[in-house]
Amino acid sequence: MMTKEDYLNEYKTHKSMRDNVKRDNYRLQYHLMPPTGFLNDPNGLFQKDGVYHIYFQYTPFTAGWGTKLWGHYTSKDMINFNQEEPFLYPDISLDRDGVYSGSAFVEDETIHYFYTGNVKLTDREDYDYINSGREQNTIHMTSKDGYKISEKELILSNDDYPIDMSKHVRDPKIFKKNNYYYMVLGGRTSDNQGCVLLYKSKDLINFEYYNRIEVDDFGYMWECPDLFELDGELFLVVCPQGISQRGYDYANVYQTGYFKVDYDFDNNTYKISEFKELDRGFDIYAPQSFLDEKNRRIQYAWMGIPDAEYNNQPTVDYCWQHALTMPRVLSYKNNQIYQQPLDEMKNLRLEKIVSNCKNIKQKDTVVYEMQVDFDKSQDFVLQIRDDVQLSYLNHVLLFFVDIIQKFLLPFLYFQDILVYLHL
């Protein structure tokens, strides 16, 4: 457990850690990073009264995995962010081993938060952290301002999940339809099949099991589900674990993508499309979206991945690790989800350089945006740096980055579609 008082007391002893972070040349210029320590999933995203609230999984005193808090940033323009005090602490018995991922739902001027309280029963003889020895408590509380919260209350526990589920059920997200509230939870069955559990409520407090969304033999665990409507269609974004690579498909450690869902809520039946990856970059996981006051569906994700073979030692040496992706505005057309940077990002632009030369001298800056126009479609190789390359060969667009031992690895690809890469 860690109360706010525990955090503040330990914070006083880590000045050298904060000083190390300030000295690091690898700190990013326009991505949200942990002030110190380790960041992963974005959580509880919303905008209220003109203020964006961005929470995230946060381990403040180590640059690796540890007991999770919720970190907190706020912004009025999505360009300038304020670092707030941590928002949630593992300070009750129901979340003593970490306040895991969750979400926010705003209605009638009240913010409803839902998250998974993690409890490890390591003293039990049958403890294996998969099928026994773990509590996955779904916890709810409210707030009027995004800072002060009501008392935490348990709304779902292990006994409320289907009997064939393992102890891996987590990451609640709320979706409203026809005056009912639906909660999705990522899950893993006892026989290692990934799925999403669907619960239904009239009041955001009392939830009853409603259904599950699943696909045969498609991973052993589905994490971080997000069910939402976009341009008149219903989508389920999810992160399946345990899918084998097929050519360029599913090349990441774990996948991040979506299903288009045709759900008949009157009869509680559904049809589901094939899974499509949202992003083929290697550092992408646990996306979460929200509607802002301009009615834009904005998505953040963790710019990292669990269990990666490579590490981030250069930043770990300076006592921090990972960041959130740039926020993306989602839309649906041509039978796929499109992702574009926020218009607000244009406000980061400074001097414009126009060049028709083959070689462009780099300006004295660590960040730049490159726009390249082609007058006809043909194969090309664009060498951005010695270790970064963009190519279009045989109808496949590949982005390469030098990750390991000066060998260019394919970082993402698109095939025969219009793309905008923001480098």
Q: Residue ranges of each PLM-predicted region?
A:
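N-terminal regions that are enriched for targeting/export leaders
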Residues: M1-Y52, Y58
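Beta-rich accessory regions
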Residues: T13-M17, Y254, K260-L423
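Blade-edge beta-strand/turn elements of extracellular beta-propeller
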Residues: K22-L32, K76-I92, S143-P162, K202-F218, ...
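Hydrophobic core segments of beta-strands in well-ordered, beta-rich domains
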Residues: D41-F61, E85, Y100-I130, T138-H140, ...
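Blade-loop segments of beta-propeller domains
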Residues: T67-D108
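Beta-propeller blade signature
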Residues: L69-D77, D128-G146, C195-L204, Y250-D266, ...
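Membrane-spanning beta-strands of outer-membrane beta-barrel proteins
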Residues: D97, G133-Q136, K167, Y220, ...
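A compositional/structural signature marking long, glycine- and acidic/polar-rich segments
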Residues: G186-F290
